[in-house]
């Protein structure tokens, strides 16, 4: 069996969640001995896509008569892998499936999503294609704490004081940076901690409220665009806290990596699937910014217990071997029944 694993974003997004998902799928297939290609014009038995932007490429695979799988809702912080759109008006936030995404998903043979709540959302949004849950695996070896050289990369790259704690947040740079003050307000009270916000620049930050927020942030807060993969991983390995201050659904890939890197998760309720993390067991979850800020401060002060070990044990169950076996079983079933 040969699998087309296709995701080819704009180069500046080729270190982000979609690219990391592509790497995970390829790695899982290699672990279980399955062959893969990224050439749409190659010979293959089944095709696996990850982005609504690739609908035209998916049509090429469909014309060849091969089954087509689409993985959805795993990398929502990545503009190149995003299936959802979000709007905020008069204090009310709505999340909908993008029209292009709906069209693509309804052309596929099968849709894979990480959780049952994701499946329910797609069905309610008009997806008629069969949907199965399959949480992405993770290469646990990439988060090996015995590799001091991996951890050292962050300090060589950013020249930070090793005695300071680190809080990492991920999201996107929209016009308002909604929810960001839950992150910034922690920084105003912690001179002994450095804060990094990493995201994709989807709007022009030279104008609007986001520019003002970034300009007025404390000096211990650093806003970064997408980082090289090894630098980002090193940042994760050194971070004490992984925070999701935004309101929009975050990428499950980023959450799994933070769990593997043994960061303490402090996340907004709307940013994660309810099945992925459990409050006070594998993460601290809050709805309001004030609570997120308070939780982060309490954790840094040692006033609430870590949930790191439980989270790491949970994500350790999602190995590349297990993910690869699941994918191959799904692929074989579709090929057999085509």
Where are the regions a protein language model picked out?
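Membrane-proximal helix-turn-helix segments that form the acceptor-binding/catalytic region
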Residues: 76, 91-111
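A short, active-site helix/loop in glycosyltransferases that binds the activated sugar's phosphate group
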Residues: 104-130, 138-142
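Conserved donor-binding/catalytic core segment of Leloir-type glycosyltransferases
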Residues: 160-178, 184-187
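Glycosyltransferase donor-sugar binding loop
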Residues: 170, 194-210, 225
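Nucleotide-activated donor-binding/catalytic signature segment of Leloir-type glycosyltransferases, i.e.
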Residues: 208-230
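Aromatic "clamp/platform" in nucleotide-sugar-dependent glycosyltransferases that forms part
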Residues: 247
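Short hydrophobic beta-strand element within catalytic cores of glycosyltransferases
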Residues: 264-267
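Conserved acidic donor-binding segment of nucleotide-sugar-dependent glycosyltransferases
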Residues: 279-290, 297-303
């Amino acid at each position: 069996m040969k699998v087309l694993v296709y995701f080819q974003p704009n180069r500046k997004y080729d270190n982000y969640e979609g690219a990391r998902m592509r790497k995970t799928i390829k790695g899982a297939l290699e672990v279980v001995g399955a062959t893969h290609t990224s050439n749409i014009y190659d010979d293959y038995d089944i095709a696996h896509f990850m982005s609504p932007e690739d609908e035209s490429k998916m049509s090429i695979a469909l014309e060849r008569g091969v089954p087509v799988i689409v993985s959805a809702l795993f990398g929502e912080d990545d503009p190149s892998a995003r299936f959802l759109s979000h709007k905020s008006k008069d204090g009310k936030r709505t999340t909908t499936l993008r029209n292009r995404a709906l069209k693509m998903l309804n052309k596929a043979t099968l849709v894979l999503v990480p959780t049952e709540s994701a499946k329910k959302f797609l069905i309610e949004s008009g997806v008629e294609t069969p949907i199965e849950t399959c949480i992405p695996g993770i290469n646990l070896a990439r988060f090996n704490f015995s590799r001091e050289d991996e951890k050292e990369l962050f300090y060589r790259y950013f020249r930070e004081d090793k005695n300071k704690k680190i809080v990492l947040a991920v999201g996107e740079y929209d016009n308002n940076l909604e929810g960001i003050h839950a992150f910034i307000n922690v920084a105003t009270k912690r001179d002994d901690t450095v804060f990094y916000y990493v995201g994709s620049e989807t709007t022009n930050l030279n104008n609007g409220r986001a520019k003002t927020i970034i300009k007025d942030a404390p000096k211990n807060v650093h806003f970064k665009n997408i980082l090289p993969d090894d630098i980002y991983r090193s940042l994760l390995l050194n971070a004490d806290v992984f925070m999701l201050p935004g309101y929009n659904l975050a990428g499950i890939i980023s959450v799994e990596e933070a769990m593997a890197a043994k960061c303490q998760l402090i996340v907004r309720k709307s940013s994660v699937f309810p099945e992925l993390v459990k409050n006070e067991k594998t993460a601290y979850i809050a709805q309001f910014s004030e609570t997120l800020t308070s939780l982060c401060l309490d954790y840094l002060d040692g006033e609430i217990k870590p949930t790191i070990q439980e989270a790491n044990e949970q994500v350790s169950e999602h190995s590349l071997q297990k993910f690869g076996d699941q994918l191959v079983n799904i692929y074989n079933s579709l090929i057999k029944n085509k």
